[in-house]
Design a protein with these regions (language model features):
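Alpha-helical scaffold elements lining the catalytic groove of polysaccharide deacetylases
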Residues: 108-129
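Active-site acidic carboxylates
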Residues: 1-103, 107
């Protein structure tokens, strides 16, 4: 099955240090899965291959103001985000992992929840690339 590179994008969601790297708060909860399924290695290969084919690679981080005033309702995963001090703008933890940075063409702005589209510029990025 073929595809048109200009009509295709790979959206890399939440590949951030707070999730993906040892020593950061959320890593212990996902460490086994990341290792067992080689998530980082596979994501890098996907992004690298996409770039080689001319496909747009979009980074879609979740970030919050340092005081979490933009967090919204604090329940479920969002309560743990604040409790753990994670995904705060301007911190190393909120940054995309170094392994993917060379392949990301553009980053989504405004993601505050699980949906990559709600309140962000993702739709615009994908429609008008």
């Amino acid at each position: 099955m073929g595809f048109k590179a200009r009509e295709t994008a790979v959206v890399m969601i939440e590949f951030q240090n707070d999730f993906c790297k040892p020593g950061f708060p959320l890593y212990p909860g996902v460490e086994q899965i990341l290792k067992e399924y080689k998530v980082i290695e596979n994501a890098v290969e996907l992004a690298k291959g996409a770039k080689a084919k001319g496909v747009l690679v979009v980074g879609c981080p979740i970030t919050f103001e340092p005081d979490y005033k933009d967090l919204g309702q604090e329940f479920g995963i969002k309560a743990n985000v604040k409790k753990g001090g994670t995904f705060r703008k301007g911190t190393k933890g909120a940054e995309f992992i170094d392994e993917l940075k060379p392949y990301v063409d553009i980053y989504v702005e405004g993601k505050r929840g699980l949906d990559g589209f709600h309140g962000t510029n993702l739709d615009t990025i994908l429609r008008y690339r």
